[in-house]
Structures are given as structure tokens and as C-alpha cells.
């Protein structure tokens, strides 16, 4: 005897079929139901047979995206009706033009933005030329930057005579005193003139023939004197400039003057050692020796040349002292008061600058005394 439930279980096992197959299985269930209690079952358990809804009538495969679709397949075919409607609303919102006058009602700050001109065409005239004053000022600035620079002869004249500037804060950009001072210090500390003079056997020439007149100093001494002379001329030119960088330049130039004095002092001490003086006066009872007297005559000439060059160093020291007095730096240091700070950047304290000036004058006085002593003993 066949059981009617077998057919129902078989029909309900196919879940992947469409909804129409499911409805047909329900009809078969009604026709094959057993009489008796099964037929008197509650009719509410039997699914009704109304007109199927659109969602249930769609095939099940429409709810799944084809993973093997081509890359050019439009995405709209996979969107549900709800997502498609949201996309249409977003597109309409972005395509709507913005009314800036309405933004002013929301925020007062945005009202100013609505009144301004935001079109590029209004910045240009009919011929395509710019009419914006900001652009015109930028164009004139560009023409100024591309203007030809002064010739080298003009720069040389500024370097030689020193510029006269009404605005001291801008003068240093024209004269270049800071760069010249740095180059001077580099030249003095890297030059081999002093070392070449010290390595020579004598700072002055010796004549082989006895009784001959002293000749000119040798080439090494001439090179030393010429280089020191040129260095002191640069120092004088920078000190006479009216730029606003003197608080930096005075200490740097003081270092340069110290280096020049050191060269002169080294030559003078070598001269005294070669003459055998060692700070002592010449013995008048010493027997006459023509060669020794010739050496003393040549040494006297060299000492006189060095002494004549010291007036340049004396002038530079006087200029530095005058500049310090003009700024009232030296007076406040002597009184022990707090010195005023100038408007320009101060590289060293006034006390340090005053001490450097005092050291310069002491070195100059000591060197002058040594050379005068050589002249007296020779």
C-alpha cells in the first residue's frame, strides 16, 4: 500500500525551482490527500492560490550577480529598485546649480562670497590683456627682477670708495662689506707670505761685497709688506662705510688687524734675532766689523719699512675707537653701566668689543717699541 506522504516529501525537496513548481506541488497534495481526518484538516493550513506578486514571479537567479560578467557590463542591471532610486536622487542633487544668494540667508559670511566676481573672463579685457591690479603689480615686479644689473665697473667703484646710503638698514645689501670682511680674514689666515718670510734665513738681504750700500728688501719681504698694505686699505674702506653692520664688522676687522700686527711682529723679532740684539743695546766698545755693520744697516732699512707701515694700523685703530665712542659703548663700559643695545643685531657684547680695541692698541704700542729698539741698537 502506497503512502501519500512520499509524494509530498519528494515534491518539497526541490527548493531551487521556481515558485510555479511549488504551487503545482501544493495542488497534487490536495488531490492525493487521504479521506477522513486528513480531508477535514484546517483549510487555513492549505496555502491560498492568489495571483503571484511580482517579486515572487521573478526568477531566483535575478537576485544573484553574475560573477563572470564582462567588465563593460553596466552596474545598473545589478542594482535593486531601491538603490537605483537613491542613485537618481543623488545625481539630481549634484546637478542642481548652487544659488549663492540663498547661502547668504543661512550664513552671513557666505553672503560676501556671493557678491564677488568669480569668473576668469572678467579679469581680462577685450584684447585679452589682464586688468587686475594685483596681476599688473606682479608683472611690474617681474620686469624689475629681470632688469639688467649694474656693470662690474660700477660694483668696483662702490667697493673702492664705499657707498653713501641714506638708509643704513639697506646699505649692507649694496656695499657687501660683510662679504669683503670674510674674504679678508680668509686671505690673511690662509696666506703663506708670513710663513715664507719666517722660513727664510733672514728678513733682510745681505750683500756679499763689503762696504756696499744696502739694497732693496728681498721678494718675500716685499710680498709681505704689499699684502699687509692691501689688507689695511680694505679695513679702512669698510670702516668708512655707512652701512648698519658695524656691530658685526668691528670685531671681524679687529681680528684682521691683529693678524697684520702679528705678521709685522714676527718679522721684527726675526730681524732682532738675526742681528744678535735680543733686546740689548749695541756695545760701543765692540771692534769694528764691516760685515756686521752691513747687516745692521740692512736690518735698519727693514725696520724702517715696517715702522712706516704701522701708521696704517694706527689709523684703523683710531677709526674703531671713534666708532665705539659714537655709539657710546666705550663710555658706558668705563663707567660700569649697562650699555644700550643698538637696533641692529649685536654679534658681541660692548665689553668684548672694548676689550678687543684695548688689545689692538696694546699690540700696536708693543710692536712700535720693539722696532724703535731695533733702530736704536743697529
Curated annotation (Swiss-Prot):
Gene expressing this chain? nsrA
- What is this protein called in UniProt? Transcriptional regulator nsrA
Annotated segments matching region Disordered: 1-59, 143-167, 195-217
In this chain, composition skew of type Basic and acidic residues spans: 8-17
Q: Which residues cross the membrane?
A: none
Cellular component GO terms, alphabetically?
nucleus
The family database entries (InterPro entries) matched by this protein are listed as: AflR
Organism superkingdom: Eukaryota
Organism per entry: Aspergillus novofumigatus (strain IBT 16806)
Amino acid composition bias (Low complexity), ranges on this chain: 18-27, 195-212
Biased region (Polar residues) positions are 143-156
Q: Which GO terms describe its molecular function?
A: DNA binding; metal ion binding
Amino acid at each position: 500500500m502506497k503512502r501519500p506522504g512520499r509524494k509530498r516529501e519528494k515534491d518539497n525537496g526541490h527548493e531551487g525551482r521556481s515558485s510555479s513548481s511549488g504551487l503545482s506541488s501544493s495542488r497534487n497534495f490536495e488531490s492525493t490527500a487521504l479521506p477522513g481526518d486528513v480531508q477535514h484538516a484546517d483549510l487555513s493550513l492549505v496555502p491560498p492560490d492568489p495571483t503571484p506578486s511580482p517579486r515572487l514571479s521573478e526568477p531566483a537567479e535575478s537576485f544573484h550577480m553574475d560573477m563572470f560578467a564582462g567588465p563593460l557590463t553596466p552596474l545598473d542591471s545589478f542594482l535593486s529598485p531601491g538603490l537605483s532610486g537613491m542613485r537618481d536622487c543623488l545625481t539630481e542633487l549634484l546637478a542642481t546649480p548652487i544659488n549663492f544668494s540663498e547661502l547668504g540667508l543661512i550664513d552671513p559670511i557666505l553672503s560676501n562670497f556671493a557678491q564677488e566676481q568669480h569668473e576668469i573672463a572678467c579679469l581680462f579685457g577685450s584684447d585679452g590683456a589682464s586688468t587686475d591690479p594685483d596681476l599688473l603689480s606682479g608683472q611690474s615686479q617681474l620686469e624689475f627682477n629681470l632688469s639688467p644689473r649694474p656693470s662690474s665697473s660700477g660694483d668696483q667703484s662702490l667697493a673702492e670708495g664705499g657707498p653713501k646710503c641714506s638708509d643704513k638698514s639697506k646699505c649692507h645689501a649694496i656695499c657687501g662689506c660683510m662679504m669683503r670682511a670674510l674674504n679678508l680674514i680668509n686671505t690673511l689666515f690662509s696666506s703663506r707670505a708670513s710663513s715664507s718670510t719666517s722660513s727664510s734665513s733672514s728678513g733682510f738681504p745681505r750683500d756679499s761685497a763689503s762696504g756696499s750700500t744696502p739694497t732693496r728688501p728681498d721678494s718675500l719681504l716685499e710680498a709681505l709688506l704689499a699684502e699687509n698694505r692691501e689688507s689695511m686699505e680694505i679695513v679702512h674702506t669698510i670702516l668708512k662705510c655707512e652701512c648698519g653692520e658695524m656691530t658685526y664688522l668691528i670685531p671681524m676687522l679687529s681680528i684682521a688687524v691683529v693678524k697684520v700686527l702679528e705678521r709685522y711682529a714676527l718679522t721684527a723679532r726675526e730681524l732682532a734675532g738675526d742681528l744678535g740684539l735680543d733686546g740689548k743695546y749695541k756695545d760701543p766698545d765692540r771692534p769694528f766689523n764691516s760685515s756686521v755693520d752691513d747687516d745692521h744697516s740692512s736690518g735698519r732699512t727693514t725696520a724702517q719699512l715696517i715702522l712706516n707701515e704701522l701708521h696704517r694700523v694706527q689709523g684703523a685703530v683710531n677709526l674703531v675707537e671713534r666708532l665705539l665712542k659714537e655709539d657710546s659703548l666705550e663710555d658706558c663700559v668705563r663707567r660700569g653701566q649697562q650699555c644700550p643695545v643698538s637696533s641692529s643685531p649685536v654679534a658681541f657684547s660692548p665689553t668684548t668689543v672694548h676689550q678687543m680695541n684695548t688689545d689692538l692698541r696694546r699690540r700696536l704700542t708693543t710692536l712700535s717699541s720693539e722696532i724703535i729698539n731695533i733702530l736704536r741698537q743697529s
